[in-house]
Amino acid sequence: MSGRRYSQISQQEGSSSSDDSDSQQKKTKRTVAHRSPNTTLNGMPRVDSRARPNENSGQSKSSNGRVDTDRKMDLLRKRSNLVHQTLLLEKEVRVRRNAINQRDDSFLSGFIKSLLEIDSSVVIYNTENPDNPKTKQVMPSAEPKKHVKLNSSISSIRFTQHEFEAESEKIIHHSLKGDIEYLPSFKFLLEIKVRTIDYALLFITYKIPHFARKELSSFSDSAIQCLDIVALLRAFSLFAHHYSYRCNTWFYLSKHMKKVASANMDAQCFYVQNSFYKITILYEIKFDDLGFVQPNYCISYILKNQNEKIVSITSKLLNQLDKRFSEFVSLFGFREGSLLLLQALFKPHLG
């Protein structure tokens, strides 16, 4: 009885376990059957790594293409604007240049006419035709005047002799001799050719004193190449002014410094020295493109004593000498500033 009951219980347990396994298999089959192809076994969405990059690549290429096209169009528009602005600027420059050239030509013609003192009288240029002896050509003459003063910018120039000769019916060769009012030793000669119809300048040559050639010839040569007689005469006048001022300054410094040191000079430099050092002041006459003077001056020194202690002391004394020189000149002018600095450097107890 008890054995039969035990076998029944075992059969029931076996049947229940088999039922559980069957139900689990059915459940698993249902889960697999209802799972989408785009999901994993755990039910998570599957990511297709092959399709998406291709789509993004196509989109990025198209967007990059649009950006490049827009950038090119923008650059082309900017280039077109720059070309247009450049053309407008070039046109404006040409208009202004033509106006300036016309004004300069008019001024130069009037200047030459005034310079040569051309009046209403005429000089006969002999072009008689053998077939018609009465045929002659006439042209304006330039009557010489002594000590002719020009406009205020070059008023110091004096013309002492004026000779002319007709080279053709339209060209007159003029020879002008003159000097500078405050430097009579600066005597010059100008040879010019002028077209009588419009007083246009065709040719210039010049002669100046030997002492002026070193500093004046370079600018004068460039001026005659440009046929700029105004700048040439202005340079003559201003050179004479600065040359005279420089000479007077050297004599002024020499008068005061010879009491305390040895002083010497040449055209461009002034030298002062004692047993310890030698000071040199340089004054050069230089010109800009219009013939105005831009003087260049500086100071330098040379140590003479070889004693280390003295060299050390003098080096400290002369340190930043250029800077001190510039300060003195800006405060007191070139002449007085140079004198005050030299007096400070050459006190009696130093040399």
Swiss-Prot record:
InterPro entries listed in its UniProt record: Sim4_Fta2 (IPR025213)
Primary location: nucleus
Annotated Pfam families: FTA2 (PF13095)
Compositionally biased intervals (Low complexity): 7-18
Span list, region Disordered: 1-71
Keywords: Cell cycle, Cell division, Centromere, Chromosome, Chromosome partition, Kinetochore, Microtubule, Mitosis, Nucleus
Subcellular location per the Swiss-Prot or TrEMBL entry: Nucleus; Chromosome, Centromere, Kinetochore
GO cellular component: inner kinetochore; kinetochore; microtubule; Mis6-Sim4 complex; nucleus
Biased composition (Polar residues): 54-66
Disulfide bonding pattern of the chain: none
Gene Ontology biological-process annotations: attachment of mitotic spindle microtubules to kinetochore; cell division; mitotic sister chromatid segregation
Transmembrane domains' residue ranges: none
Subunit structure: Component of the heterotetrameric kinetochore subcomplex COMA, which consists of fta2, fta7, mal2 and mis17. The COMA subcomplex is part of a larger constitutive centromere-associated network (CCAN) (also known as central kinetochore Sim4 complex in fission yeast), which is composed of at least cnl2, cnp3, cnp20, fta1, fta2, fta3, fta4, fta6, fta7, mal2, mhf1, mhf2, mis6, mis15, mis17, sim4 and wip1.
Family assignment from sequence similarity: Belongs to the CENP-P/CTF19 family.
Protein task: Component of the kinetochore, a multiprotein complex that assembles on centromeric DNA and attaches chromosomes to spindle microtubules, mediating chromosome segregation and sister chromatid segregation during meiosis and mitosis. Component of the inner kinetochore COMA complex, which connects centromere-associated proteins and the outer kinetochore. COMA interacts with other inner kinetochore proteins to form the inner kinetochore constitutive centromere-associated network (CCAN), which serves as a structural platform for outer kinetochore assembly.
Protein name: Inner kinetochore subunit fta2
Organism name: Schizosaccharomyces pombe (strain 972 / ATCC 24843) (Fission yeast)
Gene: fta2
